[in-house]
């Protein structure tokens, strides 16, 4: 009865009790549960939607709700992910068996990345893969995607695959000209099928630009992931109230560190410098390591337009040769950037570190600094690795040597604590002044980069520990333990492909199965294969089997770093979580009890959004790199369509074989091309980690992808002459 139903969870239970007995329409359910009144009606509909989104009930084509029984229905439900080749996949675990359902682009039926979908027409293979098609979209992730306007009210999808189009309100079309790229929110319900095209209603959120605009491709990627260069007018208005230099009244209550030898170390082109460092060695051999971070929270009042926009963006996005900042440049490159030769407001973490690398004590306080020099990684590496001293660095060499000493000690300490070092397979694009890709280089972490990373980790750890024991609201950076099954699956792949020795893998698998392993074991395993030619593949497979780090309002430790306490404190110019950490540092001095209680309530949602926007920025950065690779290989193809490239297979699935060329470009071989290789007797050569030789088959700029054909003639040779 309705009087017994007190909240939405009770309503859900009552719905499940009813559909357990028989299938019911929404009206029959409403009647059976005595749903009356607007409030009860709204809660009832919300409960129905939540149950359907979680895959607990199923709404059939006749309008009946029933319990979602995968075996009985012959359907499964899950979150769809769509790769750049147009194929979708859904991971579902049922009765202890995890299956990857593969959906051809012809059977996506309008599904977009991250949507919750129901799959039908399932055909299981011999492995844990199955083919399926999307029956319906239960919930849109956000429904936003890019279309290109072709006139007369018609749109074509620009970046998504499949036969999909949208119909937008006429009043929204008035602002458009043919060739406009627009960000459209697509409804989940298909309204028609016309000439094999799924038609959806849509609403234009933003005109991104015109297809002929410079940098339109990068603007398109950014818009897809929620990043825009323009700031709202109210943000621009607030900027006018923020000073461009430190004022005398700003110094009140701050420790004056302007007489210390403090400096920054960043990339050569970095303009938003939010961290500076200094160090002293004590007479008894200890170190006082100081990390000074731009005090952005001093200038950005909570809930002001600048703060609201930063919260919305979550992070800065670095897209090839351009940056979409979290704050306007007047903030990120100006008053909050720790530029050389000017006073800046900071939050400082002083750490007393033992000769063995243990942080014995720390202090966190507001300060003012005056950076002595803007250093860059290349110059500092010249000093520390080659003993070459660039002009202007002479007076800083003794300090840099002490810092190097401290960094090496911290590296060893982190190793003992279980920090897992993965091989970086990151690639950076080197561009011309106009943004044209010139080459692709692997990112390397040298002495200077490692030094800054170690110092920032030390500061982040100290701040996290401080707040954990203070027991006040805070944002933490957490990384959970790996899923044992996923890790074992990755190890079995390495064994099957004969990339690693069977004995070494079996030892680790047995430890995992017996529950007797930790991050030290994983670290030892990776170190063991560090000189293996396929170490990047080994490292990548292990890394992708692990969960991603995220933000959370509770301190749960960081598995990958082997740390009990961790947060992000050191980049408040470009990361919203760091700004929140700054705000919540020393909260008992600044906030009353009601405010603290409010943070306890709001932090979970803030952490979830910040984690989401971090993933969006990462994906936008990856897609931008893919775009530059596609543009580069398009030029290569136009110059010489018969050029042969050497590379290595880095990933294989039934729907895709991924190859990384020696020039660091990543491309793909389709299943049909692999089938052809098998037919002519070359299948035994095609394994994970194998060297292969390819020609460019096709390049798609909208989908940011390069397709290869295997060069069978070269595959059969023992010695290959590869064109440079």
Where are these regions (language model features)?
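Charge-lined substrate channels and their catalytic hotspots, especially those that engage the 3′ end
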Residues: 2-290, 297-343, 374, 381-382, ...
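Electropositive polyanion-binding surfaces
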Residues: 31-34, 189-193, 214, 220, ...
